[in-house]
Amino acid sequence: MWRYLPKRSLDLNRKGLMQRKLDDKYFINTFDEETKLYSKKENTLLLIVDEQPRLMKALENGEEAVLNTIALIKAFEKYDMPIIATEQYPKGLGSTDERILDLIDQKNIFEKTIFDAAIPEVLDFIEKNNIKKVVVAGAEAHICVYQTTRSLLNLGIDVFLAKDALASFKESQKEEALKTLREMGAVRTETETILFDLARDSKDPNFKFISGLVKEMRAR
């Protein structure tokens, strides 16, 4: 079985044919030197940016973004992967959606007033936990998510933007932000893609759980 190796553009497969290698940033898991597979999940973080009801209710597809974020949370928890969240000026916008609060460790929710969620508390968490890749969900895609992703990319962190777990006041604003961030180097993806990328194999012990999440999403 051919396996991708990190940080190489070309290599030979078993048949001696040249095969292009993808950059590390396209793999949601980090590379495991022992197995020679992209299978390490503990270095991938779910960052939930400002999913507060007062904000999300004013955004196009805001409820869909929250529901898909919840699916991501459940998947990350199933694989024991780290999750953190930020709140933009909670005195004015209120706290994080209660459905999210019920699922995550509240000590990993950080308040902020600046739009960029790459605040000292978040960066400290990333450094202490050796985070290499970040999946971003939240709002608004063209403001806080945009500035956060730009900062993370500038630090050399691979960023995955879960399109259907992001929201803006207008869908066109989200699309423009995603386009620009992709040009910067972020990976544009969707919640369902992320879920199956975490499982990778129908023999994975958590595949049935992941499949259940996807069925719930498709039934909405």
Task: Set out the residue ranges of the language-model regions.
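Active-site-adjacent betaalpha module
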Residues: 19-22, 26-43, 91-220
